């Protein structure tokens, strides 16, 4: 027989946070401790992928990529990539009990780019190893996001004007990869950070 047990279904973004949405960093670890104290066995978190329009966890760009909005901004301070004042400047005085994805999109990405500009040589080496370990999906994902968000301004794939890119012609992909190298590396960095926060929460 199975032992009777119970748990909670809640997406990570629903956790209270001073930074717009709950994250897989400190807020998730505190919630896990709360569940343990309440003698709960399970936390069903729902998908944690990189969401698109509407921010639905069931409409993601990748089955493997994490959602950058779930990065704990305080952890970026601990890693030395942002200052506490910079993180506070990105807050929008919203209630910690309300998720506002539109304002989050306006405030979070400039901070992510600032953090990326401060990556250390040691972290670059770790990111290179991470990229190699995830070569089956990460480079394609990062290229796709750079194309969609930067080159084609969030247009759906069928509206991309360059047919050879839409059709994934090798010479076209090589061209846009070179053109968007900085944007691709930025998105790989975000996925590396996503791995760090996921590992921290899993250790709980």
Give a label for each model feature:
Residues 1-19, 173:
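N-terminal small/glycine-rich loop or linker at the start of catalytic domains
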Residues 24-32:
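Short, acidic/polar
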Residues 35, 45, 144:
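Conserved, mostly hydrophobic/aromatic
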Residues 41:
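Short acidic/polar active-site loop segments enriched in Thr and Asp
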Residues 44-54:
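Short, solvent-exposed turn/loop segments enriched in Gly/Ser/Thr/Pro and often Arg
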Residues 60-82:
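Acidic, His- and aromatic-enriched active-site or binding-groove loops in soluble protein domains
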Residues 83-196:
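Active-site-proximal, well-structured secondary-structure segments within enzyme catalytic domains
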Residues 197-202:
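Conserved small/polar residues in nucleotide/adenosyl-binding loops
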């Amino acid at each position: 027989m199975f032992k009777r047990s119970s748990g909670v279904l809640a997406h990570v973004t629903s956790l209270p946070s001073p930074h717009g949405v709950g994250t897989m960093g400190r807020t998730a670890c505190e919630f896990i401790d709360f569940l343990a104290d309440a003698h709960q066995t399970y936390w069903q978190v729902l998908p944690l992928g990189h969401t698109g329009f509407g921010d639905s966890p069931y409409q993601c760009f990748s089955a493997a990529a994490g959602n950058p909005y779930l990065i704990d901004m305080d952890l970026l301070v601990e890693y030395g990539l942002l200052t506490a004042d910079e993180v506070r400047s990105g807050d929008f005085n919203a209630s910690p009990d309300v998720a506002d994805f539109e304002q989050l999109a306006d405030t979070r990405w400039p901070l992510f780019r600032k953090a990326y500009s401060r990556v250390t040589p040691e972290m670059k080496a770790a990111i290179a190893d991470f990229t190699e370990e995830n070569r089956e999906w990460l480079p394609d994902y990062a290229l796709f996001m750079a194309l969609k968000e930067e080159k084609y301004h969030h247009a759906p794939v069928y509206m991309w004007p360059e047919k050879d890119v839409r059709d994934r012609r090798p010479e076209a992909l090589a061209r846009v990869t070179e053109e968007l190298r900085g944007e691709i590396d930025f998105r790989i960095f975000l996925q590396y950070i996503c791995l760090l926060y996921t590992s921290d929460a899993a250790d709980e």
